[in-house]
Amino acid sequence: MTNFQDKPNIRIMFDSLAPTYDKINKILSLGLHLTWNHSFVSLLGRSDHLLDLCAGTGHVALSYIQKYPQASATLVDFSTKMLENVQECHPLAPFSYVISDVTSMPLPNDTFHLASMAYGLRNLSSPLEALKEVHRVLKPKGRLGILELTRPATYNPVHLLHKLYLNLVVPSVGRFYSGNSYAYSYLKESIRNLPCDTSLERVFHKSGLHIIRKRKLLFGTATIWILEK
């Protein structure tokens, strides 16, 4: 399996969302994504440098350097507008920027001890190829942390509430604040179409990355995996 689903031109979509992306996501998640980011950073552990993939507006990298002030980060994203947002809002942050798709990064082999990918896995058109590329740039025993929005299991008591939330709240709030209901309908569909854990973890294994830790957050509405090369 190399494609989770057919993707729209999400580069254009994310460029259009960049000015309001943080505000909308705070509202949509009731601020929980900030708590999840902190949990994610804690599980990533200490490193001098973080490779932040699908970096968006840089919240994970910012949380990381707040926890580890001596660290720096390389932010990779295919959305120019998202990375420009980080540069404008945080001009003094110890960041370098790479505008690139994760499937083909202009980075050398065996370079990074630690990489992160938050809320980006479900947007990859070729997840296996992207993870193989991450494997290429990680040093031996290097680690990749993945934080992703996921679906609670059908037997989970919050499954129905989560489904209603995705179907009704997410597109409505996105339309109200961004004027782009399609983008947040896409968010709903991207979560709904994300394969189950078993299928995802098979892709991880095929890429050469092996799970060393896994944590479910808020009844399975988000999941953290720590993978090792």
UniProtKB/Swiss-Prot annotation:
<dbReference type="GO" id="GO:0009234">
    <property type="term" value="P:menaquinone biosynthetic process"/>
</dbReference>
<dbReference type="GO" id="GO:0032259">
    <property type="term" value="P:methylation"/>
</dbReference>
<keyword id="KW-0949">S-adenosyl-L-methionine</keyword>
<comment type="similarity">
    <text>Belongs to the class I-like SAM-binding methyltransferase superfamily. MenG/UbiE family.</text>
</comment>
<keyword id="KW-0489">Methyltransferase</keyword>
<dbReference type="InterPro" id="IPR023576">
    <property type="entry name" value="UbiE/COQ5_MeTrFase_CS"/>
</dbReference>
<dbReference type="InterPro" id="IPR004033">
    <property type="entry name" value="UbiE/COQ5_MeTrFase"/>
</dbReference>
<keyword id="KW-0808">Transferase</keyword>
<dbReference type="GO" id="GO:0043770">
    <property type="term" value="F:demethylmenaquinone methyltransferase activity"/>
</dbReference>
<protein>
    <recommendedName>
        <fullName>Demethylmenaquinone methyltransferase</fullName>
        <ecNumber>2.1.1.163</ecNumber>
    </recommendedName>
</protein>
<comment type="function">
    <text>Methyltransferase required for the conversion of demethylmenaquinol (DMKH2) to menaquinol (MKH2).</text>
</comment>
<dbReference type="InterPro" id="IPR029063">
    <property type="entry name" value="SAM-dependent_MTases_sf"/>
</dbReference>
<keyword id="KW-0474">Menaquinone biosynthesis</keyword>
<dbReference type="Pfam" id="PF01209">
    <property type="entry name" value="Ubie_methyltran"/>
</dbReference>
<feature type="binding site">
    <location>
        <begin position="101"/>
        <end position="102"/>
    </location>
    <ligand>
        <name>S-adenosyl-L-methionine</name>
    </ligand>
</feature>
<comment type="pathway">
    <text>Quinol/quinone metabolism; menaquinone biosynthesis; menaquinol from 1,4-dihydroxy-2-naphthoate: step 2/2.</text>
</comment>
<feature type="binding site">
    <location>
        <position position="57"/>
    </location>
    <ligand>
        <name>S-adenosyl-L-methionine</name>
    </ligand>
</feature>
<feature type="binding site">
    <location>
        <position position="77"/>
    </location>
    <ligand>
        <name>S-adenosyl-L-methionine</name>
    </ligand>
</feature>
